[in-house]
Amino acid sequence: MKKVKVCAPGTSANLGPGYDIFGIALSKPYDIVTIEKVDEFGIKITLEGEKAEEIPTNVEENTAGVVAKKMIEDFKIESGIHIHIVKGIKPGSGLGSSSASCAGVAFGLNELFELKLSKLDLVKYASLGEAVAAGAPHADNVAPAIFGGFTLTTNYEPLEVLHIPVEIDVIVALPNIQVSTKSAREILPKEVPMKSMVNNVGKAAGMIYALYNNDLDLFGQYMSKDAVVEPCRAQLITGYLEIKEKLKDLVYGVTISGSGPAIIAIPKKEHVIDIKNIFKEVYNCPVYYTRVGLGCYIEEIE
C-alpha cells in the first residue's frame, strides 16, 4: 500500500446544552485527505480548497501535521509522507474544519501503515491537533469525525467516548461572519449559576432520551434551550436571534454549531425549502441540507 485517500466529515459540536460533550458527523461538507509514502524522510503538507492559502503548511503549526508527527514518532515510522488536503470545510466555520483534517490524517495513517489502532485511539491522536486550533486538546468534533453518528465525550483522563448511531436530517447555514474558536471560548463565563447548570444537565439528558425514543420534537426542543453557552455566543453572530425567531415554527430545533458562525437546524421536512430561503434572505450564505453521517472512511487505496 503506497497511498490512501480518506473522506473526513464536517461535524457539529455542542448541539445546545451538550457543550464540549455532544457532537455529530455530517454527510457534507467534508475534506479529502490523501496520504502518500515518499522516499524523502519527513512530513510534507499541501492544501487546496476553502481558504487553503490561510492554513499553515509548517508541520508544527498545522493541526493535521501535529497529529502526523506524533503518530510517526510513537510508531517509529521510517517512511516519509506527503499529506495533501482538499478543504471542503471552511476554516473557522464552526463545522469542525481542523478536526476533519486531524481525524482524516489519523485515520489514514492507521490504514496506510496498518497500525491497527481502535477508534478511541484515533480520537486520542486526532484531538492532539485540536490544541493548535483551540489551545487545548478537544474531542467533541474529532470523536464524531472518527465514529460517525452522535457521540458523547464523557471524560478526558482517561478519554471516554460513547457512540449512538442516528439518522437525522439537518440544515446547516454558514453566515459570512468571522468567529475564532479562541474568541468564542473567551466570551464564555468562568462560573455558571446552579440554575443554568441544572437546566443544561436536564436538557442534555432529555436529548439522549429523545434519541432512543426517536422523538425529534423533544430532541430539537431541548437542543434549542442552552442556558450557558448560546446566550454568550449569540452576541458574536449578527442576526442569530432573528433567525431563531423566524424558524421557530419550521424546525424541531435550532442552535449554534460549535463556536459558530454556522447555525444548525433540525427541519420539519415539509418546510425545508422555506428554511433554506429564510437563511439565504437573512445571511445570503451557503446552506447545506444534509444528514448525520458516517465517520472517516477510505475512498481510495493504491
From Swiss-Prot:
Any one GO molecular-function label of the UniProt entry: ATP binding
- Disulfide bridge map: none
Where ATP binds, per the record, is at 90-100
Which coarse location class describes where this protein primarily resides? cytoplasm
InterPro entries the UniProt entry points to: GHMP_kinase_C_dom, GHMP_kinase_C_sf, GHMP_kinase_N_dom, GHMP_knse_ATP-bd_CS, Homoserine_kinase, Ribosomal_Su5_D2-typ_SF, Ribsml_uS5_D2-typ_fold_subgr
Give me the reactions it catalyses: L-homoserine + ATP = O-phospho-L-homoserine + ADP + H(+)
One annotated Gene Ontology cellular component of this protein: cytoplasm
Q: List the Gene3D superfamilies hit by this protein, alphabetically.
A: 3.30.230.10, GHMP kinase, C-terminal domain (3.30.70.890)
Q: Tell me the domain of life.
A: Archaea
Give the pathway: Amino-acid biosynthesis; L-threonine biosynthesis; L-threonine from L-aspartate: step 4/5
Q: What PROSITE patterns does UniProt report for this protein, alphabetically? A: GHMP_KINASES_ATP (PS00627)
Record key words, sorted:
Amino-acid biosynthesis, ATP-binding, Cytoplasm, Kinase, Nucleotide-binding, Threonine biosynthesis, Transferase
> Pfam families from the xrefs?
GHMP_kinases_C, GHMP_kinases_N
Q: Where in the cell is it found?
A: Cytoplasm
Q: Which GO terms describe its biological process?
A: threonine biosynthetic process
Query: Might you give the EC number(s) for this enzyme?
Result: 2.7.1.39
- What does this protein's UniProt record list under function? Catalyzes the ATP-dependent phosphorylation of L-homoserine to L-homoserine phosphate.
> What family classification does the UniProt entry report for this protein?
Belongs to the GHMP kinase family. Homoserine kinase subfamily.
What is the name listed in the Swiss-Prot or TrEMBL entry for this protein?
Homoserine kinase
Species of the source: Methanococcus vannielii (strain ATCC 35089 / DSM 1224 / JCM 13029 / OCM 148 / SB)
Top-level taxonomy: Archaea, Methanobacteriati, Methanobacteriota, Methanomada group, Methanococci
